[in-house]
Amino acid sequence: MRAQKIAVRSVPFSRVQSVNKATQTETKPAEFSVGQKVVYPGHGVGQVQTIETKEIAGTKISFYMIRILESDVTVMVPINKVASVGLRAVVSSKEIEDVYSMLRDKKIVVEQTTWNRRYREYMDKIKTGLIFEIGTVVRDLCVIRQDKVLSFGEKKMLELAKGLLVKELAIGEGSDEPTIEAQIEQIFTAVA
């Protein structure tokens, strides 16, 4: 049996702390009510429209019917699968401050890896639906953007991550999206 090589990279403490805080926002099943705004990983913020029970293969299953705000698509999430799909409440005001602190922490080291590998890592972070993970993608790409022109793929990735981040922060703060986007851009245009 051949030994496998494992690449190890150090992660700044602030990142570890952010990820730990992000996992605290996971919710237990059946904690959402009709009208509540929630985050569905990979799709963004949605609103619980109804809670319905459907019979599937002879078994009654309760679902959250969630309308995704950005795309106006309705998604059915089984109540007993909330944790496994990553459905969670919108970020709290305390977490919003932590997100802005993380964005301001521009002392990151971008590994010298291929764009394809970074792309996969960033997509994995976005797919978690955790605001701190999405925020790290935005921060990292904005920091890279200060040193070089982003490729087409990097620009699209930044646009996707920033859109998800801005939408959730706007709802969490009770603000509008252009204001939040301007605040984020201000963080990265300010002289370090």
List each model region and its residues.
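Short, solvent-exposed secondary-structure boundary/capping segments
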Residues: 54-65
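Conserved hydrophobic positions within beta-strands
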Residues: 46-48
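A short macromolecule-binding patch
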Residues: 65-67, 71-80
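A residue-level detector for short acidic-glycine micro-motifs
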Residues: 50-53, 68
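Charge/polar-rich, low-complexity and marginally structured segments
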Residues: 85-192
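Mixed-charge, Lys/Arg-rich low-complexity intrinsically disordered regions
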Residues: 2-34
